[in-house]
């Protein structure tokens, strides 16, 4: 199975930091955000990844490309550990492809841009703003990996969800599963997805997270999806049509998630990853503890 990662967005929520730097290249400790999402794909067994980019996102393409000059310099200076870290950015058995989204026509259109490279096959979609904490779940078995396994077993498209406080439901797409309660790692049929409902009208508190596994049927539906909210082709509209056509399931994620397209969410992720960093975590945690005493 291939994965499509739309990275063509302008990152306006993170301005001014993203004026000249793609939001996906903002660093979380010592790696850019996009690296964590690609690593998640690789851990789940995905070997072919399609990045849907924009002309302003060359830094992303360069990050996953080979840098002969850098590698030669590190080799000459016997910086073996750094050399291995640079070479591991894109594992040898993983292919990362790029396709441009010429016009900003929405998330549905961005996903559709990946069709020529994916082909008429099932595929995963990963929204790079959303980070699933690698320290809170086994990425080789849970979440995306489990969604793919569930899809392979049932043929039902999977949409990742997580519970949010009822007072926050109006900020999310919310899954209507007919009142069925889910635990982590479980799936249930979706009747509909309601975009940003009022608290009174929300069918549940299961918010869509930003991880999808779609059957190939979604491709033709995306082609037929009319212009929707914001004069854009909305992925949600295509999902609504898919739900009418075949079974689509909500998959309850395991562990923690961070919205790194939001400044507070990004800062929270930085602290959480910082205190757990293999080399820097101990010193950083000590700093945080001392800082907390002064607040």
Curated annotation (Swiss-Prot):
Matches recorded under Pfam families: NTP_transferase
Keywords noted in UniProt: Nucleotidyltransferase, Transferase
GO biological process annotation, one example: UDP-alpha-D-glucose metabolic process
Molecular function in Gene Ontology: UTP:glucose-1-phosphate uridylyltransferase activity
SUPFAM superfamilies to which the protein is assigned, alphabetical: Nucleotide-diphospho-sugar transferases (SSF53448)
Enzyme kind, highest EC tier: transferase
Catalytic reactions of this protein: alpha-D-glucose 1-phosphate + UTP + H(+) = UDP-alpha-D-glucose + diphosphate
InterPro entries assigned to the protein according to its UniProt record, in alphabetical order: GalU_uridylyltTrfase_bac/arc, NTP_transferase_dom, Nucleotide-diphossugar_trans
E.C. no: 2.7.7.9
Superkingdom of the source species: Bacteria
Similarity comment: Belongs to the UDPGP type 2 family.
Family matches, as PANTHER family: UTP--GLUCOSE-1-PHOSPHATE URIDYLYLTRANSFERASE
Function recorded in the entry: May play a role in stationary phase survival.
Name this protein carries in UniProt: UTP--glucose-1-phosphate uridylyltransferase
Native organism: Haemophilus influenzae (strain ATCC 51907 / DSM 11121 / KW20 / Rd)
């Amino acid at each position: 199975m291939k994965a499509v990662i739309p990275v063509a967005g302008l990152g306006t929520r993170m301005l001014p930091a993203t004026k000249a730097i793609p939001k996906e290249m903002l660093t979380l400790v010592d790696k850019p955000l996009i690296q964590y999402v690609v690593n998640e794909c690789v851990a789940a067994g995905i070997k072919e990844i399609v990045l849907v980019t924009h002309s302003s996102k060359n830094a992303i393409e360069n990050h996953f490309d080979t840098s002969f000059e850098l590698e030669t310099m590190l080799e000459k200076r016997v910086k073996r550990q750094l050399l291995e870290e640079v070479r591991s950015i894109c594992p040898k058995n993983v292919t990362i492809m790029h396709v441009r989204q010429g016009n900003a026509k929405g998330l549905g259109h961005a996903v559709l841009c990946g069709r020529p490279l994916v082909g008429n096959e099932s595929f995963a979609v990963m929204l790079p703003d959303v980070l699933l904490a690698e320290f809170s779940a086994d990425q080789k078995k849970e979440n995306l990996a489990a969604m793919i396994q569930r899809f392979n077993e049932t043929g039902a498209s999977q949409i990742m969800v997580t519970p949010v406080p009822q007072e926050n439901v109006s900020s999310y797409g919310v899954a209507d599963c007919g009142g069925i309660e889910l635990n982590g790692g479980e799936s249930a049929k979706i009747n509909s997805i309601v975009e940003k409902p009022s608290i009174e009208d929300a069918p549940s508190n299961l918010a869509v997270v930003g991880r999808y596994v779609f059957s190939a049927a979604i491709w033709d539906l995306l082609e037929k999806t009319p212009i929707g909210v914001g004069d854009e082709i909305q992925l949600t509209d295509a999902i609504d049509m898919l739900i009418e056509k075949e079974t689509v399931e909500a998959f309850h994620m395991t562990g923690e998630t961070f919205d790194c397209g939001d400044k507070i969410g990004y800062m929270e992720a930085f602290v959480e990853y910082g205190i757990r960093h293999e080399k820097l975590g101990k010193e950083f945690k000590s700093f945080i503890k001392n800082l907390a005493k002064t607040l």
